[in-house]
């Protein structure tokens, strides 16, 4: 049986809207993905956390990523494909400057991955434009 080459990337993938939670923290804008579980497109209404709002918290990767990255490293991951929440970087979709808190989160995440020996593979999440940006199209 042939062995995988040393350079083969073992890993997994996540989607920001499915794992991050923290939908309304550190300046993140409301994305179309935040609205979809509620069956309507439009302005976000205040909500009570419940099973129907599970994506609001998801696995709370935004706050618990160090623990998750450590588990991925323990599992032997050498890469992790993540998506970047557009509404966390450009909350309204038309800003000239990015949201520094959003950039800082991804900086910390990438640093944690590097320390664990996990190569980041990133993509913008295609279903994550800000609600304001999506509504203007």
Residue ranges, per PLM feature:
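Generic structural "secondary-structure junction" signal
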Residues: 6, 21, 25, 56, ...
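Aromatic- and Gly/Pro-rich amphipathic surface segment
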Residues: 30-70
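Substrate-binding cleft and catalytic face of glycoside hydrolase catalytic domains
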Residues: 67-137
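Mature N-terminal, pre-catalytic/accessory segment of carbohydrate-active enzymes
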Residues: 1-10, 15-16, 58
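Short, solvent-exposed beta-strand-terminating loops
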Residues: 14-39
């Amino acid at each position: 049986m042939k062995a995988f080459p040393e350079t083969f990337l073992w890993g997994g993938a996540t989607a920001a809207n499915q794992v991050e939670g923290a939908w309304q923290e550190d300046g993140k804008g409301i994305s179309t993905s935040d609205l979809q579980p509620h069956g309507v497109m439009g302005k976000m209404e205040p909500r009570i956390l419940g099973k129907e709002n599970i994506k609001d918290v998801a696995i709370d990767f935004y706050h618990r990523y160090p623990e998750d990255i450590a588990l991925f490293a323990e599992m032997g991951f050498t890469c992790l494909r993540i998506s970047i929440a557009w509404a966390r970087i450009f909350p309204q979709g038309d800003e000239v400057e990015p949201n520094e808190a959003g950039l800082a989160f991804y900086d910390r995440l990438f640093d944690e991955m590097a320390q664990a020996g996990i190569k980041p593979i990133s993509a913008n999440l295609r279903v994550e434009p800000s609600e304001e940006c999506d509504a203007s199209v």
